[in-house]
C-alpha cells in the first residue's frame, strides 16, 4: 500500500534537479503521484474503505497545489513533469 524506500529513492533519482535534491516540487509531485496510484489500486479491491478515500483526496489536493506552484513559476518544467507522470493538465 505504501511505497518502499527503494521505490522512493528511484523517484528521487529520476526527478531530482541536482544530485542531493530530495525536496524539490517535482520530486514531491512524483512521490505523491506514486502514493495516489497505490491508493487507487487499493480501492479496486477495497471499495468501502472511506477513510483511505479521504486520505486520497487530501493527497490529490496537495499534488494539485504543488503543480499549480510549478506551473506559475516554470511552465516548461510543468509541461515536462505532467507528461512524465502521465497526468492531465490543470485548468
UniProtKB/Swiss-Prot annotation:
Pfam families reported in the protein's UniProt record = Ribosomal_S15
One GO cellular-component annotation of the UniProt record comes to:
cytosolic small ribosomal subunit
The terms under GO molecular function for this entry are: rRNA binding; structural constituent of ribosome
**Is RNA-binding tagged as a keyword?**
yes
Keywords annotated in UniProt: Ribonucleoprotein, Ribosomal protein, RNA-binding, rRNA-binding
Q: What is the top-level taxon of the source organism?
A: Bacteria
Matching entries from Gene3D superfamilies are given as: 6.10.250.3130, S15/NS1, RNA-binding
Q: Which GO terms describe its biological process?
A: translation
Q: Quote the function comment for this protein.
A: One of the primary rRNA binding proteins, it binds directly to 16S rRNA where it helps nucleate assembly of the platform of the 30S subunit by binding and bridging several RNA helices of the 16S rRNA. Forms an intersubunit bridge (bridge B4) with the 23S rRNA of the 50S subunit in the ribosome.
Per UniProt, subunit arrangement is: Part of the 30S ribosomal subunit. Forms a bridge to the 50S subunit in the 70S ribosome, contacting the 23S rRNA.
What's the family?
Answer: Belongs to the universal ribosomal protein uS15 family.
The record's listing under PANTHER family reads:
RIBOSOMAL PROTEIN S15, BACTERIAL AND ORGANELLAR, SMALL RIBOSOMAL SUBUNIT PROTEIN US15M
> This chain belongs to which protein, by name?
Small ribosomal subunit protein uS15
Source organism per entry reads Rickettsia typhi (strain ATCC VR-144 / Wilmington)
Amino acid at each position: 500500500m505504501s511505497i518502499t524506500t527503494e521505490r522512493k529513492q528511484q523517484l528521487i533519482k529520476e526527478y531530482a534537479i541536482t544530485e542531493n535534491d530530495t525536496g524539490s516540487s517535482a520530486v514531491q509531485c512524483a512521490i505523491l503521484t506514486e502514493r495516489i496510484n497505490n491508493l487507487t489500486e487499493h480501492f479496486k479491491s477495497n471499495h468501502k474503505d472511506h477513510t483511505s478515500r479521504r486520505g486520497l483526496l487530501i493527497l490529490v489536493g496537495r499534488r494539485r497545489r504543488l503543480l499549480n506552484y510549478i506551473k506559475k513559476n516554470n511552465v516548461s518544467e510543468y509541461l515536462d513533469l505532467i507528461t512524465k507522470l502521465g497526468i492531465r493538465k490543470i485548468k
